[in-house]
Amino acid sequence: MPPVPRLPGRDAVPRVVVIGAGFGGLAVAQGLANSGTIITIVDRQNHHVFQPLLYQVATAGLSPADIAAPIRSIVKRQKETRVLLAEVTGVNTSQRHVLLSDGNTLEYDALVIATGARHSYFGRDEWAEHAPGIKTIDDATKVRRNILLAMERAETIRQESLPDRDEYLTFVVVGGGPTGVELAGAIAELTRHATDMDFRFITRRCLRIILVEAGERLLPTFPAKLGDAARKALEGLGVLIRLNGRVTDIGDYGVRIGDERIATTTVIWAAGVQASDAAKWLDADADRSGRVKVEPDLSVPGHPEIFVIGDTASLVDASGRPVPGVAPAAKQEGMHVARSLLARFTGRRAPLPFRYRNWGNLATIGRKRAVAEIGTLRISGLPAWLLWSTAHIYFLVGFRNRIAVGANWLWNYLTFETPR
């Protein structure tokens, strides 16, 4: 692979701009540490968020600080790395400039776009106001506030027959993938525990937690046996499962599934994602979800100096399988890009085309309940939950966060007290 050519007048020291400080972006920056490369990380937030656990912030299982870490603290030992709090509005590929919302630009010799994805409402963006998703700390705290306020308001209505009370105590999660399953289970445990311990005029039989999935089963990317195990675990928590349920409208009143109108004040969206605007910035080919179609080395066709990774990229890897938009894949892609850039800048042989190593699929359904697929191994129940917990603590960024989350989970497991 030839080295990346530099434009005339540029410094001899390579400049790498990384847009996005998620799993993939940080893996690139850390992989280039102490390489003599000037690295600039650009992000709209000054902290990295462990997104797989955002749902636990939304359901009062963890505090926001437990799953967030300042980006500058993560790379503080990398003297050649700087962090820029800014919003990217475009890329000038001919001049190799990243365009920022404040009018400034950043020069690059190599660019890595790891901007992730946002929620997709399948052309009904007006639903977002009534059915927020959970992609950021702000999203999670908003959902948590909505859930807890709904229960507080229901507590003030003493007569169980009043319709307003039912609306406050009905919680609808749209989407039966891992996020939706984990969220529905966590809401069920939170609300059941709260009614037992904290409230005086709400009982478990007043609650309705509804999980809506458009397909024929939950967890469609998992083996059918594990999807069935997840369904049974959720039903054991009192969650109502609506399979083959097509959401036709969401508004102030609640949600409509087919012809059925469900009155609720809390609808949470976990049904689909759309890639960031990277394809528009680059004028690149994209798939139906807006993800940039990349080469086997994760570079953009026609632009060997630009890489796209994580949820923003669409790739069928060397094994012939599509790379999923999950945290382990983004991290592996980031490490691969870092190795590729080091090879290019030093004139060494490039690594082989990217190949995703799938370490398995995990999803939890409350305390002591989870499903796991690790190679040919398929397990559920407590062993899967312990595996899920260990894996998530391992991938957390920062020793403090690992200790805090582990301690919180142990305390919650023993006492079920939640840091609200």
Question: What are the language-model segments listed below?
Answer:
Residues P2-V4, V13, E333-R420:
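C-terminal, flexible cofactor-proximal segment of oxidoreductases
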Residues S101, A114-T115, G245, A270-A271, ...:
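Short, well-ordered coil/turn residues at beta-beta hairpins
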Residues E129-S161, Y253-R256, E260-Q332, R339:
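FAD-site-proximal beta/loop scaffold in flavoenzymes
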Residues M1-V17, T81-V172, I257, I268:
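FAD-binding core/adjacent interface of flavoenzyme oxidoreductases
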Residues D164-F222, A229, L240-R242, P324-A343, ...:
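Rossmann-like dinucleotide-binding core of oxidoreductases
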Residues P2-L85, T89, F171, P178-F222, ...:
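Beta1-alpha1 glycine-rich phosphate/pyrophosphate-binding loop at the start
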Residues K79-V91, A188-P296, V300-G302, R349:
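A Rossmann-like FAD-binding core segment of flavoenzymes
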Residues G24, G116-H119, A184, V273-A275:
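Short glycine-rich anion-binding loops that position phosphate/pyrophosphate groups of nucleotides
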